[in-house]
Curated annotation (Swiss-Prot):
The keyword Cytoplasm applies. Belongs to the class-II aminoacyl-tRNA synthetase family. It comes from Alcanivorax borkumensis (strain ATCC 700651 / DSM 11573 / NCIMB 13689 / SK2). PANTHER family: HISTIDINE--TRNA LIGASE, MITOCHONDRIAL-RELATED (PTHR43707:SF1), HISTIDYL-TRNA SYNTHETASE (PTHR43707). The keyword Heme does not apply. Gene3D superfamilies: Anticodon-binding domain (3.40.50.800), Bira Bifunctional Protein, Domain 2 (3.30.930.10). This is Histidine--tRNA ligase. It catalyses: tRNA(His) + L-histidine + ATP = L-histidyl-tRNA(His) + AMP + diphosphate + H(+). HAMAP family: His_tRNA_synth. Homodimer. One of its GO terms (cellular component) is cytoplasm. Its main location: cytoplasm. Keywords: Aminoacyl-tRNA synthetase, ATP-binding, Cytoplasm, Ligase, Nucleotide-binding, Protein biosynthesis.
Length: 422
């Protein structure tokens, strides 16, 4: 017997019993995004490798260790996208969407990183991303944060997440701070964990992200980035906080919050939870005013975020909402009545748009068909046999809760089904 082929480690199938929850989440998110006037954009999952080297940064863990990169038959280096922002910027610049105009965009789809698979962290994972372009003030920063807060309410997660904020200033601010931080950390080098010691020379701000207890203790005495911000960056951050205060959005200023992507500046934020263990960040974003120019376009202010769908699913499953069954009505034919039963099913799909009508196929006894009707999750079963056909009626049988089966005229079936489903 041939060896079975299975999915790649860290790249998971989403099975039929799971897709209902995914569709519910996607519909909720889509409705909120539409209410803010955001438009969907769809980008390819494969891009030129240079796109991510130039945007994310060549000395980041993502580019050095985690990207799925390969050469195609022409010898071009291509990469499965590890995140969506760079692709969105590339698409907007390529198609002239940023020329003298603002944009509010969103996208959803799979991303790829070669990481150690664990709960909430996979090699193929899915994100919903939001990107805005052409707006400089703290008002658009506040809008994208308000949008995420509304998403949590729509998903029933508002009590499970906390907002953390920081400002990274501009590149000159970060350079001054970097020098001060390096001097401090070198004086405490032996107290740092191994990963932080490696990061110190190449990407010292990433040390602020360390989860190591000893390193966290060292960082308590480290210089604060807030003391190195220019006046404009300070005013921007204060303006954002004032807008969030006025909107009733609670937040915590986290001086150690940095992002793992080199293009961020000024505002950065994360929504975190303590319900997922080590994978506590469910949404992260910030401002990246230099990225469009970095990728060959004109200077363009921008701010956005991405949220991990798998992590949201894990959160939602802890208090799983009552989702409707994938099938509302299960239709069964008993005897030589398949053609009229199929016609009845088509009639119901016309009469009850939005309802799922499933016709039993494959024949079988009454008992076996009823078992399959029950397993389908349908609320109502419809039975048509030769006697029903001759009498012009259909048997309507409730499959969930209370209620007696009844026979109704074929022309009244849609109304009868509706009454059982309400």
């Amino acid at each position: 017997m041939s060896k079975k082929i299975t999915s790649i480690r860290g790249m998971n199938d989403i099975l039929p019993e799971q897709t209902g929850l995914w569709q519910w989440l996607e519909a909720k998110v889509g409705a909120v995004l539409a209410s803010y006037g955001y438009q969907e954009i769809r980008m390819p999952i494969v891009e030129q490798t240079d796109l991510f080297k130039r945007s994310i940064g060549e000395v980041t863990d993502i580019v050095e260790k985690e990207m799925y990169t390969f050469d195609d038959r022409n010898g071009d280096s291509l990469t499965l996208r590890p995140e969506g922002t760079a692709s969105c910027v590339r698409a907007c610049e390529q198609h002239g969407l940023l020329y003298n105009q603002t944009q509010r965009l969103w996208y959803a789809g799979p991303m790829f990183r070669h990481e150690r698979p664990q709960a909430g962290r996979y090699r193929q994972f899915h994100q919903i991303g939001v990107e805005t372009f052409g707006m400089t003030g703290p008002d658009i920063d506040a809008e994208v944060i308000l949008l995420t807060a509304r998403l949590w309410k729509a998903l029933g997660l508002e009590d499970k997440v906390v907002l953390e904020l920081n400002s990274l200033g501009d590149s000159a601010d970060r350079a001054r701070y970097r020098d001060a931080l390096v001097d401090y950390l070198k004086a405490h080098f032996d107290d740092l964990d191994g990963d932080s010691q490696k990061r110190l020379e190449r990407s010292p701000l990433r040390v602020l992200d360390s989860k190591d207890t000893g390193t966290r203790e060292v960082l308590k005495g480290a210089p604060q980035l807030a003391d190195y911000l220019n006046d404009e960056a300070v005013a921007h951050f204060e303006g954002l906080k004032a807008l969030l205060d006025a909107s009733g959005i609670a937040y915590k200023v986290n001086p150690y919050l940095v992002r793992g992507l080199d293009y961020y500046g000024k505002t950065v934020f994360e929504w975190v939870t303590d319900a997922l263990g080590a994978q506590g960040t469910v949404c992260a974003g910030g401002r990246y005013d230099g990225l469009v120019e970095q990728l060959g376009g004109k200077p363009t202010p921008a701010v956005g975020f991405a949220m991990g769908i798998e992590r949201l699913i894990l959160l939602i499953e802890q208090e799983r909402p009552e989702l409707s069954a994938p099938v509302d009505v299960y239709v069964m034919a008993m005897g030589d009545v398949l053609a009229p039963t199929m016609a009845l099913s088509e009639h119901l799909r016309d009469a009850l748009p939005g309802r799922a009508i499933q016709l039993h196929c494959g024949g079988g006894s009454f008992k076996s068909q009823m078992k399959k009707a029950d397993r389908s999750g349908a609320a109502v079963g419809l039975i048509m046999g030769e006697d029903e056909l001759a009498s012009g009626v259909v048997t309507v049988k409730p499959l969930r809760g209370q209620g007696e089966q009844v026979q109704v005229a074929q022309g009244d079936v849609a109304n009868a089904v509706t009454s059982f489903l309400e």
